[in-house]
Amino acid sequence: MKSILLLFSLIVLGSATEEVSRTEQTSTLFSVEGEIALPSTRNCAKWSAGARIHLNHGQYMGFVRQDCTFRVDFVPTGTYIVQIENTDFVFEPIRVDITSKGKMRARKLTILQPNNVNTLPYPLRLSARGPARYFRKREEWRITDMLFSPMVLMLVVPLVVMLILPKMTANDPELKKEMENMQMPKVDMPDVGEMMANFFGGSAPAKKKAVTGGSGSGQRRK
């Protein structure tokens, strides 16, 4: 009889200890809550059905209510990255720090500059950055693409230099004198007007050279 009572008391004591530990554990768990701001053209009640709230890439997960609010329960102390998983909009992830006393501190997640702290208000308010794009927009043809192509630049730049350089030399006597002192060989610059006329109007007829023969060249010597 005594052994039965002793066994019963041990069972009751073990269950009570387990219940106390569970109570202490649940008392140290917290909730992450906030609100989602969508564009005015989108109905939140329909959008919320396919949206999920992920903490640390799915370690803890919550759902979005029809009024665009959310709450993730039973979250222990630590640092978490809050993300909104959906197929329609792009949201920036937010970092949330939960202290042992239950104090929530939210800030922007800056991977490139971790020392840069931009605090955010709590409860969270997440705004859509823009619609999600799964395809790259097709590039349109523009006239500037043709004008700045390498082939066009190779043709236009030398032509511009040929037209501007003689005018600059004629208007600046000092530059013209320096060019003459350099004793550079004179290069006949082509006439642009004549070149264009030959290109569009056809080439000018070639001049016939007079052929004269000597009197003694065609006769045989005797």
From Swiss-Prot:
Membrane-spanning segments: 146-166
Q: What residue ranges lie in the Extracellular compartment?
A: 17-145
The record's subcellular location field reads:
Membrane
- The answer to whether keyword Transmembrane applies is yes
- List the membrane topology term(s): Single-pass type I membrane protein
Q: Which residues form the signal peptide?
A: 1-16
What's the chief localization of this chain? membrane
Q: Does the keyword Membrane apply?
A: yes
What ranges does the Cytoplasmic topological domain annotation cover? Answer: 167-222
Return the InterPro entries for the record: EMC7, EMC7_beta_sandwich
GO CC annotation, single: EMC complex
In terms of Pfam families, this protein maps to: EMC7_beta-sandw
Q: Which residues form a coiled coil?
A: none
Q: Which UniProt keywords apply?
A: Membrane, Signal, Transmembrane, Transmembrane helix
The family this protein is said to belong to: Belongs to the EMC7 family.
Q: What is this protein called?
A: ER membrane protein complex subunit 7 homolog
Source organism: Caenorhabditis elegans
Upper lineage ranks?
A: Eukaryota, Metazoa, Ecdysozoa, Nematoda, Chromadorea
